[in-house]
Regions:
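Short beta-strand-loop/turn "lid" adjacent to the catalytic site in phosphate-handling enzymes
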Residues: 1-3
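Glycine-/charge-enriched secondary-structure boundary and capping motifs
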Residues: 5-28, 35-51, 62, 122, ...
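A cross-domain feature marking catalytic cores of carbohydrate-active enzymes
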Residues: 33-34, 55
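Active-site glycine-rich loop that binds ribose-phosphate moieties when present
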Residues: 52-66, 100-123
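Acidic/histidine-enriched ion/cofactor-binding microenvironments in catalytic or ligand-binding pockets
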Residues: 57-83
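Glycine- and other small-residue-rich loops at beta-strand/loop junctions that grip anionic moieties
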Residues: 69, 80-81, 105-109, 134-140, ...
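Short, Lys/Arg- and Gly-enriched loop/turn segments at beta-strand edges
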Residues: 84-91
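Gly-rich Lys/Arg/Thr-decorated short loops/hinges at beta-loop-alpha junctions or inter-strand turns
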Residues: 93-99
Length: 206
């Protein structure tokens, strides 16, 4: 549906954008595949482009990496950005979100977490013998409760192998950062698609 020249230009711009983000993270794009959609694209054509990345790397054996497991008793949870995007987008589909709230969410979602990682690494470099992070994960498709449950499952497998008591997580709701407007939208009855599964995950969390 698009001319070869336009396809090449769009692909070039996409790759430039991806590389500009990867360079900041110290990563390189080393390959990939392209597929042409069967759907007739709508203008602007750039909005019809979908891209995804698979990340692979090699760890220096002198360094430790942040895995999902490894939580320790007494650990505190660091949440690097507010929660509630699922609720906000559910309300957005019903035209119930104020523009400034949506703008702030999109701006935050586009912000790299690189500065936070650098800050933690700096703390580690100051005291190399202190392990600042015991476990780490992203909060994406399974929400906060889903990912915490995964971390608990991974951690407690190791706990049982060492004949230690399984850990539980205590969440202080007032200390969990959420986007502006989320609590009001909850009161109006909006919920994310994860709400039913979150009720199941609550069994592992106090």
């Amino acid at each position: 549906y698009l001319t070869n020249n336009l396809q090449q230009e769009l692909l070039f711009q996409v790759l430039e954008g991806i590389n500009s983000a990867l360079t900041i993270q110290g990563a390189k794009l080393i390959g990939g595949h392209t597929l042409e959609s069967r759907k007739i694209p709508e203008e602007p054509f750039a909005l019809g482009i979908e891209s995804s990345l698979t990340v692979n790397g090699i760890i220096d054996n002198k360094k430790y990496f942040w895995s999902k497991g490894g939580m320790k008793k007494g650990d505190q949870i660091l949440i690097s950005r507010p929660l509630g995007t699922g609720i906000i987008f559910a309300a957005f589909m019903n035209s119930k979100v104020k523009p400034y709230i949506l703008d702030s969410v999109l701006k935050e979602m586009n912000k790299s977490q690189h500065d936070i990682v650098n800050y933690i690494n700096q703390l580690t470099n100051i005291n190399p013998h202190s392990k600042i992070v015991n476990a780490c994960t992203d909060i994406t498709g399974f929400g906060l409760l889903g990912h915490l449950s995964e971390m608990l499952e991974s951690t407690n497998r190791d706990q049982l192998k060492m004949n230690l008591e399984p850990l539980k997580i205590i969440l202080e709701m007032d200390n969990i950062p959420v986007y502006d407007g989320v609590k009001e939208l909850l009161d109006q009855g909006f919920e994310s698609t994860l709400a039913p599964s979150n009720e199941i995950f609550l069994q592992n969390i106090d």
